[in-house]
Amino acid sequence: MAKLLSFSDESRSSLERGVNALANAVRVTIGPKGRNVVLEKKFGAPDIVNDGDTIARDIELEDPFENLGAKLIQQVASRTKDKAGDGTTTATVLAQAMVREGLRNTAAGASPVELRRGMEKAAAQVVAGLASRSQAVEGDSIQQVATVSSSGDEEVGRMIAEAMDRVSVDGVITVEESKSLATEMEVTEGMAFDRGYSSPYFVTDADRQVCEFENPLILLTDRKISTVIDLVPVLEAVQKSGSPLLILSEEVEGEALATLVMNKSRGVLQVAAVRAPSFGDRRKAALADIAILTGGTLISEDQAMTLDKVTLEDLGHARRVTISKESTTIVANDNHSEAVSNRVAAIKRELDATESDYDREKLNERIAKLAGGVAVIKVGAATETELKNRKLRIEDALNATRAAVEEGIVAGGGSTLLQLAEDLNALAAQLDGDQRTGVEIVQRSLTAPVHQIATNAGHNGDVVIETMRQSGQGFNALTGVYEDLMATGIVDATKVVRLAVQDAVSIASLLVTTEVVIADKPEPEPPAGAGGEDPMGGMGGMGGMGGMGMPGMGGMGMPGMM
């Protein structure tokens, strides 16, 4: 494919236009009075969202160079989201301000490399300052963090705090859609473990990059599955039942994985494969625990059981399964409470008998996973659009609360960043030249979140910043009052703020040092119907898997598994 090249100031200017296009769409959502953004969908009603990462991922610009700038900011949002679960809008606002200041100084003749070094030194001091100001989460702080992160929704804050109280701060909490208008929370049996899907083609929700099944069947085995022939009987039975299927095994690979992926892609069978947690004997124990939880049978080599003899009666059942790239959560049906209790009692007896500290640790983990349960927050709303928006807010609030438990909290509303900006004066005084300018770039940019929060609330951002500096108080954008935000419960998770600063500095400093941009040259679209080809003709070759020697699959409408 031919390439387009752009150099020097022209290249940086095009990147900045892309950065601004995306950041301007995202920044309106920050703060308790942030606005919503409407996203057009190819099918169905548009989405109305207040989530920075969702907005960023939906933006694609026509100009290839500007689009690269937008993609860089998308990376800021997604990296912050992946590591902290929240803070994407703050990171975007910071990155935009740093890019603007950095490119302005570069155009004036500053050394991009020295600017970058100064920015990195400033970021290191800000991170240290956050750590020194951070306070551990205790008491009502959990509810306060959740409330602030959900844009002031006290019901959400109370519900998340209650969920963490019921299943512990390290417990499993999931968010799902309710069949009613009310938002409610319940605790049910379930389990989560650190294993994700074996292939990204199993994803059912492309926006969130997760695979979700309602009322799935679960095949449990400690075997490695390489060929599909052993799975044919159970796959036929599951396909006829109409239920989704989750396969938990030592590993699904090769021909078996390719066949499952193809039939999932064709819509023939809703299926996903996940590697079982742990290793060796502990893997077998974990699979046995899941079998008890779901009412299934573990197809084990130790008992000379084979996959070709599996029936629907051997499969486990769950209310819901959510699989991400790195983890799997199973929400059980509560139909096997007695069996789970007996299993926990048996593990406790094993715990009493062991003298190994390592074994004790692993046994306690198994007990916690089995007995801890899963807190399920069911989100209700009057319309589907409102439901999606509310669900995103609750997920963000939950992620921010977990981050707060991990690294503590600082005063919110951008007030901590404003204080840390003042502290950079001493660092700037120690440096000279363009490194000092790099520190000043970060210093000025740290005021951007406060400025935007105030602007979204209908106040003059410059006036608010100056008043905060003179009074030493934070600005409550919800009430318009200057007060001690930590004392009034307006707090941010330290981890979220830290990652927002680090990711923003990382991308901005790289962009400032960019000299050449290379993009793909857009190819003209061919006229409709050109060449007289069938637009779906490319699918015809998928019938060629008939050579696998499984003619019995043809009768169930699964030609790809023949």
Curated annotation (Swiss-Prot):
Upper lineage is: Bacteria, Bacillati, Cyanobacteriota, Cyanophyceae, Synechococcales
Reactions catalysed, semicolon-separated, are: ATP + H2O + a folded polypeptide = ADP + phosphate + an unfolded polypeptide
Write out the entry's keywords from A to Z.
ATP-binding, Chaperone, Cytoplasm, Isomerase, Nucleotide-binding
EC class (word): isomerase
What gene does this protein come from? groEL2
Q: What does this protein do?
A: Together with its co-chaperonin GroES, plays an essential role in assisting protein folding. The GroEL-GroES system forms a nano-cage that allows encapsulation of the non-native substrate proteins and provides a physical environment optimized to promote and accelerate protein folding.
- Its source organism is Synechococcus sp. (strain CC9902)
> Which of this chain's residues are annotated to bind ATP?
29-32, 86-90, 413, 476-478, 492
Annotated protein name in UniProt: Chaperonin GroEL 2
Where it sits in the cell: the answer is: Cytoplasm
